[in-house]
């Protein structure tokens, strides 16, 4: 009879060890991702025009030959994780291993329309990622956010006081907006009949510009912190307004909240939604709040999608925010005085929620 410990077979214990080690060293995944972005490897392969060998990559990077083996190790590991494809190519009667871009690494090609490299650079900067070393201290602080514990101030105050990281953050949000905009191009129903819209927390206007291009007769106001919009110039149907969404929101037929409410507590979200309700038109279907957020559904979503949503929920908890289930969204809408809502799928893990006053 096989021995057991705590009622578990050795094979089960070793599986547990493998899982434990996988997560102990999971930070290396993020650092290898940062490595390929910092070295512009996706751009190098893209510009190469075909799969690249390690020797070619080492030559372009101009790293010491003594590190060629390490480059190969990291490339092999990132290929295993889906960031590159390992292929065999024929060169001068010799077959060599080479690396090609995948759908994931194509999103890291700087200068392309859809590029998430700024998101990698912002999130994996020690300013943000280093804060997670304070999780234990944070969990015992009644009111402070994780970033409040780590940075010494509220995250939004920190951005105001640190222009360099503020730019990195805005660039990251703009890059993420491009992904959402890809989905919005095929999701016209939410904006039909709307003549004016306020993009609350709209940053530098990346999403608003796509909306204006798609609906040229729609007037769009980008509403954000004064320091974000103070030097930005509008167009005929796009304008910028600085202010505080907790005080008031500019009037329009509709209000857009894209990845805003997950930053805030339920009480803060109610306050934001109440101000948005005051701002939108009372004219039938035209007046509404359009929310782009995650909706957690552990029973229906695929395992990987659920994992992404739950990971983001932990991430947002560090701002005292959260990702929400449909029941949690519904509760917020009712408490903020809205009469109805509709949820439509938008991307793999985001939904478009229309909320009616």
Swiss-Prot record:
Pfam families: Dimerisation, Methyltransf_2. Its EC number is 2.1.1.150. The active site is at 262 (proton acceptor). Keywords: Methyltransferase, S-adenosyl-L-methionine, Transferase. GO terms for biological process: isoflavonoid biosynthetic process; methylation. S-adenosyl-L-methionine binds at residues 200-203, 224-225, 244-245, 258. Belongs to the class I-like SAM-binding methyltransferase superfamily. Cation-independent O-methyltransferase family. COMT subfamily. 7-O-methyltransferase involved in the biosynthesis of isoformononetin. Can use daidzein as substrate, but not medicarpin or 2,7,4'-trihydroxyisoflavanone. This is Isoflavone 7-O-methyltransferase. It comes from Glycyrrhiza echinata.
């Amino acid at each position: 009879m096989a021995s057991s410990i705590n009622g578990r077979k050795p094979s089960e214990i070793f599986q547990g060890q493998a899982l434990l080690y996988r997560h102990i060293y999971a930070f290396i995944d993020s650092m290898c991702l940062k490595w390929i972005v910092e070295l512009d490897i996706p751009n190098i392969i893209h510009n190469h025009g075909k799969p690249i060998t390690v020797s070619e990559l080492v030559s372009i990077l101009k790293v010491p030959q003594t590190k060629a083996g390490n480059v190969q190790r990291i490339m092999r590991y990132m290929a295993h994780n889906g960031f590159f494809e390992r292929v065999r190519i024929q060169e001068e009667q010799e077959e060599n291993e080479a690396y090609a871009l995948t759908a994931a690494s194509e999103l890291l090609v700087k200068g392309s329309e859809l590029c998430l490299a700024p998101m990698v650079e912002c999130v994996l900067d020690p300013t943000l990622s280093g804060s997670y070393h304070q999780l234990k201290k944070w969990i015992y602080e009644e009111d402070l956010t994780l970033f409040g514990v780590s940075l010494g101030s509220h995250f939004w105050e920190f951005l105001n006081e640190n222009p360099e990281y503020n730019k990195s953050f805005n660039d990251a949000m703009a890059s993420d907006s491009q992904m959402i905009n890809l989905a919005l191009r095929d999701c016209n129903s939410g904006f039909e009949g709307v003549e004016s819209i306020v993009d609350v927390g709209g940053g530098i206007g990346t999403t608003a510009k796509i909306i204006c291009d798609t609906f040229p007769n729609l007037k769009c106001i980008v509403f954000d912190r004064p320091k974000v919009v103070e030097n930005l110039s509008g167009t005929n149907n796009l304008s910028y307004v600085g202010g505080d969404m907790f005080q008031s929101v500019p009037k329009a037929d509709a209000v857009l909240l894209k990845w805003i409410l997950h930053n805030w507590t339920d009480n803060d979200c109610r306050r934001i939604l109440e101000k948005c309700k005051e701002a939108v038109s009372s004219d039938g279907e035209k007046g509404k709040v359009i929310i782009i957020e995650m909706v957690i559904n552990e029973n229906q979503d695929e395992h990987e999608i659920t994992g992404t949503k739950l990971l983001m929920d932990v991430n947002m908890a560090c701002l005292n925010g959260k990702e929400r289930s449909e029941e949690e969204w519904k509760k917020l809408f009712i408490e903020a005085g809205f009469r109805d809502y509709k949820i439509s799928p938008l991307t793999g893990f985001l939904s478009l929620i229309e909320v009616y006053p």
